[in-house]
């Protein structure tokens, strides 16, 4: 919780908005749009790959949430506050992070297929930013995003 309290101490309204936008990049809707766009516009094979990885990743993620039953950080420590705009989507258990898992599946899957170093680096940075945003918003712990 120490890292989460440190992140809580640096929150600002501007950073809250930026991190809220970044976290959307790991959302299920964004993942589905990217997978379909890759399928239609880039490669059916890569699109199928993203869809399959995303589907099974989501199933495994939900199974682990139910199996482990790890509460959200603010449930573990009622003195901890989250960015309120993130509360609506932060339902259920905390471990592992679905947004981070989606980012790893989507951007990691895309990085696997690209030969462009700059794009591969950008995709990895996006994945790390989504994981960081989940902790900044206060909805996940480092363990939640690290395992995802």
Predicted regions and their residues:
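N-terminal transmembrane-helix/juxtamembrane module of multi-pass inner/ER membrane proteins
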Residues: 1-31, 61-92
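Juxtamembrane helix-boundary/capping and inter-helix hinge elements in multi-pass membrane proteins
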Residues: 12, 41-44, 113-116
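Membrane-embedded catalytic cores of phosphoryl/pyrophosphoryl-handling enzymes
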Residues: 19, 34-35, 48, 58, ...
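Hydrophobic alpha-helical transmembrane segments
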Residues: 23-42, 99
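Alpha-helical transmembrane segments and their helix-start/interface "positive-inside/aromatic belt" motifs
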Residues: 44-53
């Amino acid at each position: 919780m120490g890292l989460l309290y440190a992140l809580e101490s640096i929150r600002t309204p501007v950073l809250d908005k930026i991190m809220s936008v970044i976290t959307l990049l790991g959302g299920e809707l964004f993942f589905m749009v990217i997978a379909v766009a890759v399928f239609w516009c880039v490669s059916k094979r890569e699109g199928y790959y993203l869809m399959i990885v995303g589907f099974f990743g989501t199933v495994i993620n939900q199974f682990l949430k139910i199996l482990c039953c790890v509460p959200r950080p603010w449930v573990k420590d009622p003195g901890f506050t989250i960015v309120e705009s993130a509360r609506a989507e932060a339902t259920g258990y905390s471990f592992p992070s679905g947004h981070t898992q989606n980012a790893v599946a989507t951007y990691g899957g895309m990085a696997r297929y690209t030969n462009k170093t700059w794009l591969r680096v950008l995709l990895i940075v996006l994945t790390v930013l989504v994981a960081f945003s989940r902790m900044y918003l206060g909805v996940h712990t480092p363990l939640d995003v690290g395992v995802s």
